UniProtKB/Swiss-Prot annotation:
A motif ('HIGH' region) lies at residues 42-52. The gene is valS. It comes from Vibrio vulnificus (strain YJ016). HAMAP family: Val_tRNA_synth_type1. Keywords: Aminoacyl-tRNA synthetase, ATP-binding, Coiled coil, Cytoplasm, Ligase, Nucleotide-binding, Protein biosynthesis. This is Valine--tRNA ligase. Belongs to the class-I aminoacyl-tRNA synthetase family. ValS type 1 subfamily.
Amino acid sequence: MEKTYNPTSIEQDLYKTWEEQGYFKPHGDTSKESYSIMIPPPNVTGSLHMGHAFQDTIMDTLIRCERMKGKNTLWQVGTDHAGIATQMVVERKIAAEEGKTKHDYGREAFIDKIWEWKGESGGTITKQLRRLGASVDWDRERFTMDDGLSNAVQEVFVRLYEDDLIYRGKRLVNWDPKLHTAISDLEVENKDTKGHMWHFRYPLADGVKTADGKDYIVVATTRPETMLGDTGVAVNPEDPRYQDLIGKDIILPIVDRRIPIVGDEHADMEKGTGCVKITPAHDFNDYEVGKRHQLPMINILTFDANIRDAAEVFTTNGEPSDAYGTELPAKYHGMERFAARKAIVAEFDELGLLEEVKDHDLQVPYGDRGGVVIEPMLTDQWYVRTAPLAKTAVEAVENGDIQFVPKQYENMYFSWMRDVQDWCISRQLWWGHRIPAWYDNQGNVYVGRSEEEVRQNHNLESVIELHQDEDVLDTWFSSALWTFGTQGWPEQTDDLKVFHPSDVLVTGFDIIFFWVARMIMMTMHFVKDENGKPQVPFKTVYVTGLIRDENGDKMSKSKGNVLDPIDMIDGIDLESLVEKRTGNMMQPQLAAKIEKNTRKTFENGIEAYGTDALRFTLAAMASTGRDINWDMKRLEGYRNFCNKLWNASRYVMMNTEEQDCGFGAGEIEYSLADKWIESQFELAAKAFNNHIDNYRLDMAANTLYEFIWNQFCDWYLELTKPVLWKGTEAQQRGTRRTLITVLEKTLRLAHPVIPYITETIWQSIKPLVDGVEGETIMLQSLPQYDEANFNQEALDDIEWVKAFITSIRNLRAEYDINPGKPLEVMLKADEKDAARLEANKQVLMSLAKLESVRVLAAGEETPACATALVAKSELMIPMAGLIDKDAELARLDKEVAKTQGEIKRIEGKLGNEGFVAKAPEAVIAKEREKLEGYQETLAKLEEQKATIAAL
């Protein structure tokens, strides 16, 4: 083994070997239990971020554990075509490089261009996945637009249409006026904005008056331009101010339209004036109110979000309607929406109908890709009827076929699924799965797997012209089929039989509805077991939190606080990090602040920590709470942990290589410490496996850390030294054998979390361990608890030995006694502890650096001593001649004064009403905790003074 641990030199070559040897593949023995995980397919445009690294570490740890249990494991890998994101990347590329738009290319040539881009640049994320040590089966890599998945998508669409679960309708969607497409709620970012609330007077028709004698009512709005499309005003039916007006009309200013006043719970009596203008074609809440009261829908905007020359009027079912005229005032024709807002407010003011304008904080929806304000827009789109599909999907979670970890996320899932809306699945893009629907010139629609099939099924002559729907399917539609589409469906393949349903889905809470719920609905509708029972896509959904920065803020390019996992593996210098965080920014004005913060936080850039340290940190932080604040200090700590394991392994090798390790015929004797470390290992194996089974990777990592660092390195290796130096041959064989076998088992136990370092060390020690065969640690067995190796007595006895040694070390530190000075020690002990002392004398003398140790006779007088309790015994160190009494008292007086000063300072802080009133609860609690600590220290110091004064 190399002298120092250098992850850079071992990781990439090792991964290449694993992949080339086919170790990541299922072993194919179907008589053994199978285990599968389908990776959430990352966007093909993407690069690996901390969220991916976190979830991939969790998945890889789980898959490596199950592979080492001998299961037939598949970790299915693949990428998502990411419709809108990919199309925009390529549009920007051709604009920058060729000054062209997609329209200059035309649809087919532009799509070819995207495929070309995918071939060149689409592999970034899969390369990075390899760097993480992800043991996915690369030979089975899939893409959501490959032939097999495209076939599955088409099949699902056609069957859903035939089952009357897909329809085309005119409904309200999130419309991106820049990208000219419908987008999902997940692609809408609500930004806090300072805006205004305009209060308009709407005159009452037919001489009607309000309860207080006014001939108008006042409505409040944050979007004045939409009033051109108003078809009603809502008041709360319980509101005494307006009850008499329900059923009456108002005359809408500017457009002179007569619209009704309706009673609806949507109007909040406490909010604003209690009267709400209703624009069903341009607001999601109003759309629902409009449906409840059969109010016509008037669309006033073009797809660019300019005012139309003539409005479009529809019934609540989206059919054309003549309930109102289509005229809009000429001066607004073609006007941009925000310019129209200003002009309409000015016209209300001129008409004397602007009651007041108030400052108002509101959330404005922006498209996260196009960066412009989203408009709710009435458009023709394709929809899935989700209610019938949701019923089965809810039952699967209710009856435990699918379990959420943590369980609280089931409630989030239920609340969505019990109030599920129809799902808009069409997008006005070119890149994606084109909708398999064709139209004739009369507007009749035909759905089928191909134009030939459509003509055949509907007896359409070749003279009848058909044109395919221009739209593509929402990316979530194809990714909803991920668990079964990747395994060969609609064919009934062996893979589908063996690996479906998958065992666990690891995902974020933000896509439980968009992806998880839809996978459950689609899978259960299309995949049935041999008894015809709907199959679930996965048995467990493990929901992770978000990884935030050290201050708890979300990582984002605009905040400049994004950490790239690869930079933590390989390291990055400060200038490159600053450039990375400030280059190509959407908002360049933020660059200076980001640069300042980056230089402050990472003075020397980021050093190379290696993959294992990163993985261990991610695992150790994977508690099942919501969010995780990233901490570079923990990463550094876990790199030190890897280093410690490396150095411990070198110590083991130096003491076992070319030595008799007790695998031959020679006599063998195991020390108490040998039996103790074996027992500690069994406890660690039991705890590790339990934690993995319960998805508590944080506790599993902690178990490894605690065992390797504290028990194996800090204690056991120390306890072996007296035996290796002075023990008999039989004792040395026993200890060498224990050293090498426990290390080998430990490497296997830790391998799923830190694969590279464990494989590297294992390859070096493998020849020293009897009976270990095989080319890689990956395919060795994962240690399980073995009662036969567990010895409670050895555990208790060594805990006593540890307590004895620790007490001596603590007393040396407390009384400032030179750590190397041999001490005389006396023990007031019962029979059991006296026997322990006798049995372990050699180890205690060596590790505690003692001159002598003896048990006191009953009633024996003792001189002034420093004392400590060890179990039921009292340990004593006679102090005479050990220290300079006056110097030690002077030192202690200084410590006492310093501690009293701290106590006074904190008491003053906590006694200050201003501080207590303003400071957060957590800060106050921390100060109280500090105070308690100082008070305990003071009591100890006084005790030490008394002991020394008595000498």
